[in-house]
Regions:
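Proline-centered turn/helix-capping motifs that create local helix->coil transitions or kinks
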Residues: 8, 12, 126-133
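Short, solvent-exposed loop/turn segments at secondary-structure junctions
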Residues: 21-23, 50-53, 123-125, 132-133, ...
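Residue-level detector of beta-strand face positions
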Residues: 33-35, 117, 133
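Rossmann-like dinucleotide-binding domain that binds NAD(P)(H)
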Residues: 1-43, 47-111, 174
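C-terminal helix-rich "cap/oligomerization" subdomain common to oxidoreductases
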Residues: 88-102, 106-109, 114-122, 126-129, ...
């Protein structure tokens, strides 16, 4: 949701969504699909499933979320790791992936948040961990992106700058509230079967550089 809002300018207007709760051991929504429109005419189709069957990292050149190479034969590891755990043990396992866990991954690529394809008027753009694939009118190209800092470091850097330098992050608290509004709107729309108007949306506090 954050990535799509950033690409579309942040100002969502309305969202229509459906959710799925397909695991009786975890009786809550674990998947959704949504159609969201933005100020200026942009429309986004968002789909997520947390049920660990299809691994969309195969669409990201077999690179994991934190930039690590996915190992051959590792399919299903996440589900197998949870099979013998009770809810408390599962919650503790998930904390090992947080900022303060002390664990790192051997990242050789930039981090990503799943497949993103932007369909534009003169080209389609596919985001990858190493750059942007460009599918133009008559040519196809690739814009390489420099390998960035350690996974999640930019988040920590923004926090330090906010506390020590009184510098507002690009995504402020208002931005987080706007993304949270989208999450609640997805649940509301799925429950009522109706589109939901968004009223707490905002832009980032930093203009994108172009040209």
């Amino acid at each position: 949701i954050d990535v799509v809002r950033r690409l579309a300018g942040g100002m969502g207007e309305k969202i229509y969504a459906m959710t799925g709760a397909w695991d009786p051991k975890r009786p809550t929504e674990g998947a959704f699909t949504a159609l969201m429109n933005f100020e200026g005419g942009c429309v986004a189709n968002l789909t997520y499933s947390g049920y660990a069957h299809f691994d969309s990292d195969i669409w990201m050149n077999d690179v994991g979320e934190l930039g690590q190479r996915k190992l051959a034969g590792a399919y299903g590891d996440a589900r197998r790791a949870l099979m013998a755990l009770d809810p408390d043990d599962e919650a503790r396992l998930k904390t090992t992936r947080t900022f303060g866990s002390g664990k790192t991954v051997d990242a050789k690529h930039n981090e990503h948040f799943g497949p993103v394809i932007a369909l534009c008027d003169r080209a389609d753009l596919k985001l990858t961990p190493d750059g942007v694939e460009v599918f133009g009118d008559t040519e196809r190209g690739f814009i390489e992106v420099t390998f960035g800092p350690a996974p999640r470091r930019t988040v920590n850097d923004a926090l330090v700058a906010a506390v020590r330098q009184n510098k507002a992050p690009v995504q402020t608290g208002a931005w987080g509230l706007a993304s949270l509004e989208v999450c609640h709107a997805i649940l509301q729309s799925a429950s009522t079967g109706q589109p939901v108007d968004l009223r707490q949306q905002c832009k980032t506090n930093e203009e994108e550089q172009t040209g």
